[in-house]
From Swiss-Prot:
Its EC number is 3.6.5.2. The lineage of its organism: Viruses, Riboviria, Pararnavirae, Artverviricota, Revtraviricetes. SUPFAM superfamilies: P-loop containing nucleoside triphosphate hydrolases. GTP binds at residues 10-17, 57-61, 116-119. One of its GO terms (molecular function) is G protein activity. It comes from Murine sarcoma virus NS.C58. This is GTPase HRas.
């Protein structure tokens, strides 16, 4: 069974733990209890493949930022979460992404941008802004509500699909013989 190491990152209070617990335990936690670091495991079937999700729910508080490099090193894919009613959390996404790329020493790291709390009417980050940011990063964008469960499975499962595609790209790198060239080789005698 394939195991996927997923890491949930984002500013404090955006609902990282609520999303993770909603996926794992099917219930909404509405009291805010700041996380230092929690790990969860769940067996799921995604696109016909049984797999084990190893999910690391991380601290959003700045005082725990020193721990980030360590879990970023081991993570295969990252849910970058902001709250749609918190513009600052959206602006912080860039820093998380840059730190992930630096620690992984790669521009090609599986990520999904997640706009959480979409059940709330008091939106300060428009869908279009988030879609534009995700497009500029070349990653998917999914809106979720940990409260109603909307998009929760989709966010985590999309990240697993991104990891799978990343692994395939590493196994079969694109042919770099130039534009317009086919990958077949000719031998003239």
């Amino acid at each position: 069974m394939t195991e996927y190491k997923l890491v949930v990152v984002g500013a404090r209070g955006v609902g990282k733990s609520a999303l993770t617990i909603q996926l794992i335990q099917n219930h909404f936690v509405d009291e805010y209890d700041p996380t230092i670091e929690d790990s969860y495991r769940k067996q799921v079937v995604i696109d016909g493949e049984t797999c084990l999700l190893d999910i690391l729910d991380t601290a959003g508080q700045e005082e725990y930022s020193a721990m980030r490099d360590q879990y970023m090193r081991t993570g295969e894919g990252f849910l970058c979460v902001f709250a749609i009613n918190n513009t600052k959390s959206f602006e912080d996404i860039h820093q998380y992404r840059e730190q992930i790329k630096r620690v992984k020493d790669s521009d090609d790291v599986p990520m999904v941008l997640v706009g959480n709390k979409c059940d709330l009417a008091a939106r300060t980050v428009e869908s279009r802004q988030a879609q534009d940011l995700a497009r500029s990063y070349g990653i998917p964008y999914i809106e979720t509500s940990a409260k109603t469960r909307q998009g929760v499975e989709d966010a985590f499962y999309t990240l697993v699909r991104e990891i799978r595609q990343h692994k395939l790209r590493k196994l079969n790198p694109p042919d770099e013989s130039g534009p317009g060239c086919m990958s077949c080789k000719c031998v003239l005698s």
